[in-house]
Design a protein with these regions (language model features):
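Conserved Switch II/interswitch segment of TRAFAC-class P-loop GTPases
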Residues: 120-123, 148-167, 188-196, 225, ...
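Canonical P-loop GTPase G-domain recognition
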Residues: 179-182, 190-255, 261-274, 278-281, ...
């Protein structure tokens, strides 16, 4: 059993799914030949030992079940069965002492040099990759090719970049293949403290109402494991009516697909059927886009399913594609977002890093609530000083910045605000975050950003964050979101 798993995995990287090769370090799948052979030999020897341990455990458990008392000794057979089952489970849990389990030999993961550097050092080596160099629709069609009709598709969305990671063509192709789509709203742990799961769920339903019929929506956190019980429940229900035992996990680059699968696998390990049957390794995850290069299949016996992780679909509308890989990681929150509330009038302009400029051109006093990474600075300055601040401070006080010369374009936003207590609309910049607008009366904003970066106006996700006690009254200051202090220029 274990040996067959090793043989299946020996040709492919267990972290990113690419095929191993020993020739060119600049191409995906490179692993030194001696390292590959030594690890493979170690795993083959270890598998024999693990099989013997597993066989002995099964014999002990079977012998214990044979000692179960006769039903005739009990007046009520229902209570007899319940007591016996509980006793067997307790005995099976303690069948292997912890110190013996810890002394078991361990199988070593076989991963490529790229995955090794990502997981050990947090570095992203630049290697040639076929699928990520293709247009998004071409990549999407290639990912969907092996998916059978009426399969289950888990579509993972980055909730912090909902519009940037939502690819409508996924729903179109899924309808053609009559797939059952479950929309996974990942990274709820990055939302502010007062975010309510029920409100997020209903918001997700409303935003996708016109894209797909009978869509299941599940808000989850791959980091904390919150929300996974609903996903497992849906998968169990669908498994009985689905001809294909494979569940395909799709999503845009950096939406958290691999992290989602790793957490799902851990949750399934807690089920009795999955005990001592963990996969050989976890999928490689990182803060860099495009970590997974080829499809990877993981078996979950407790669900009687196989989970297939697919390469991230490139969405060229995200602002991160116009930044260096190092600066792109600054836009990915690694802790809860703390909303920044600023007052807006036509006299002032706002910079989000050196990436986006927002100016109010008409209307009365409004609140702007910024939902962006804590590593991205927000600067409020007078309108006549905005360009000078950019020329002097891009990449310094205003961070991050674009990694190339770009063509700027303007987007006009007209909003009729209807409440001082609740945001009316969100201004969304793909790959960056969003800004909620709160107040009374009509107003117009002009948003300056890089050409081809995605932009949306939507219903507010977090509409109640513009509270008076959160307002930062600043003039000519920068909010350094990394430390949440007001720092003078």
């Amino acid at each position: 059993m274990i040996f067959s798993v090793i043989r299946r995995f020996s040709k492919f990287c267990q972290g990113c799914g690419c095929t191993f090769q020993h020739i060119n370090p600049e191409v995906e799948g490179f692993i030194p030949e001696n390292k590959y052979k030594n690890t493979l030999i170690h795993n083959i020897k270890t598998s024999d030992t693990l099989q013997n341990i597993q066989r002995n455990d099964e014999i002990k458990l079977r012998d214990f079940k044979l000692t179960k008392p006769e039903a005739s000794l009990y007046q009520n057979p229902e209570f007899e069965d319940l007591d016996s089952i509980e006793e067997i489970e307790e005995r099976s849990k303690s069948a292997i002492p912890l110190y013996e389990y810890q002394k078991k030999p361990k199988l070593k993961p076989i991963i490529c040099m790229r995955c090794y550097k990502i997981s050990k050092y947090g570095q992203l080596p630049q290697v040639d990759c076929e699928i990520t160099s293709k247009p998004p629709l071409t990549s999407l069609n290639e990912i969907f090719d092996p998916i059978k009709f009426e399969s289950i598709v888990l579509y993972v969305i980055d909730l912090i970049d909902f519009n940037g990671s939502l690819i409508k063509e996924v729903f179109d192709i899924s309808m053609q293949k009559k797939a059952h789509v479950i929309l996974i709203l990942n990274k709820i742990d990055a939302l502010p403290l007062n975010a309510k799961l029920e409100r997020i769920y209903q918001w997700g339903i409303n935003e996708t109402r016109n894209l797909f019929k009978n869509l299941d929506v599940a808000p989850v956190s791959a980091r904390t494991g919150e929300g996974y019980s609903k996903v497992i429940k849906i998968l169990k229900e669908l498994n009985e009516s689905t001809p294909d035992s494979r569940v395909y996990v799709l999503g845009a680059t950096n939406s958290g697909k691999s992290s989602f699968i790793n957490t799902l696998a851990k949750k399934c390990w807690d089920l009795p059927e999955e005990k001592f049957k963990r996969p050989l390794t976890e999928l490689t995850t990182s803060k860099y886009p495009g970590t997974t290069l080829s499809p990877i299949e993981i078996s979950l016996r407790s669900l009687k399913m196989k989970i297939v992780d697919t390469p991230g679909i490139p969405t060229l509308s995200q602002i991160t594609f116009f930044l260096s890989s190092q600066d792109a990681t600054l836009l990915i929150p690694n802790k809860k977002i703390k909303p920044v509330v600023l007052t807006a009038t036509p006299e002032f302009t706002f910079w989000i890093g050196a990436l986006v400029k927002i100016e109010m051109v008409s209307g009365d006093f409004k609140y702007l609530t910024f939902f962006v990474s804590h590593m991205c600075t927000i600067h409020k300055t007078r309108k006549n000083l905005a360009e000078d601040v950019y020329e002097r401070q891009a990449g310094k006080l205003l961070k991050p910045k674009y990694n190339r010369e770009i063509e700027w374009e303007q987007r006009v936003v007209d909003i009729n605000c209807v409440s001082k207590e609740k945001a009316t609309k969100d201004i969304v910049i793909h790959g960056l975050g969003w800004i909620s607008v709160t107040g009374l009366g009509e107003c117009r904003f002009i948003v300056h950003l890089c050409k081809n970066v995605g932009f949306n106006i939507r219903e507010p996700l977090m509409p109640y964050e513009a509270k008076p006690d959160l307002v930062q009254f600043t003039k000519g200051h920068t909010i350094n979101s990394e430390k949440y202090k007001i720092i003078k220029n």
